[in-house]
Amino acid sequence: MISGVSLLRGRLLVFCAIAMSALVLRLAVTSFSPLAAQISEEIGFSSTVVGVFGMIPTAMFAAFGLATPALGRRWGLERTALIAMLMAGVGMATRALMTDTWSLLLLSGLALGGMGIGNVVIPPLVKRYFSDTLALVSSVYIVGVQLSTIVPAFVAVPLADAFGWRVSLGVWALVGFAAAVPWVWVLLRHRNADAGEVAPVDRNVDGRVWRSPVGWGMAGMFGMTSLVTYSMFTWIPDILADAGASPAFGGAMVGLFALLGLVSAFGAPSLCARMTNPFPVVVACASCFLIAFAGLWIAPMSAPILWIVLLGLGPSTFPMALTLINLRSRSHAGSAALSGFTQGVGYTVACLGPLLFGVFHDLTSGWTASFAFMTVAVAVLVTGAYQACKPRVVEDSWNSRPISVG
């Protein structure tokens, strides 16, 4: 029998493990992008390869996202989280030592694969240990993810200037290895308490998500949010430069866009958890997107900060989607299946966003078609969110027995 104090300590340990893991989940992406030109000069790869590096994150997130629920059933959620952090740490450490393009690509894929597993396994862990404080722990987790996006982007170049690009690229491995430590401790405590085994679950659960309107709604909401967000991260500087802005101003607007994502991570999960059906919030976010698109298309330099602020409020649907993974599932097994499906399908679609945005621009020599593409994506987002936000759980929807959860 585990005492109340022991249980509290165990939850605190898992909380620390989740928070530290969240700080790892984007490091391999934003620590590389600012250094791509320096690395290319030394190793010698083309701009096409830089584009390949740009597509690897979402591709790995998609592939490993779809595989993670099965891994979680085989190894257990905690062990899967440990493996994810070790993959991320090893990948980030070793890729910084490579001298050829293919090794750099392969080991970047290893790091990003670990992060893809982490993306999917953390929500069901939150569900398993913190079902009574979902909004709070979800906020902590999502803020950690946003920090892992923002911090490397700001410090990668100064670190490279001071110590070289290899140190700047590899130092983030320390965060990955540090995040693995509390998971080792969690597993040891479980073994000592004879509580390390995962309860048996229906192994057909993943396939059932494919038949669920909740699953497809979540995938549409998450995927289109990610597609628009990645597209804007990539193209904001070019859109503003085409209107006469300086590169420095374009970079500052990208930073503002990222910062607003951090702000929304604080409030969106709790707002989502307090509402039986948070669809009106999604409509408000979609409206922000559409107004920003119109402004950036028609008169980008008339009020650029306003357009970017509105654009930055739109992706509040990202932390909402991550929170809904747990709010729209009954068990941690259902959460794992929904998380894998949502992020696997979502990132598969999202990886096409920046590419197609650029293709439409090149084909038309303007931004009209590109912003029309973004508008269609927002329409799909709203359609998916309508299904995702309904007060029901995925386990009931795949059995065609909808039951209210609030």
Regions found by a protein language model. Give the residues of each.
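A late C-terminal transmembrane helix in Major Facilitator Superfamily
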Residues: 329-367, 374
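Extracytoplasmic gate region of multi-pass secondary transporters
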Residues: 32-33, 213-265
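Helix-loop-helix hairpin linking two adjacent transmembrane segments in secondary transporters
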Residues: 132-133, 140-188
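Extracytoplasmic
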Residues: 13-47, 65-68, 232-237, 353
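Helix-breaking motifs and short loop linkers at transmembrane-helix boundaries and internal kinks
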Residues: 44, 76, 97-102, 131, ...
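C-terminal transmembrane helical hairpin of 12-TM major facilitator-type secondary transporters
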Residues: 276-321
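Conserved MFS/SLC helix-loop-helix module at the cytosolic interface between two early adjacent transmembrane helices
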Residues: 63-102
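Cytoplasmic helix-loop-helix junction between adjacent transmembrane helices
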Residues: 107-144
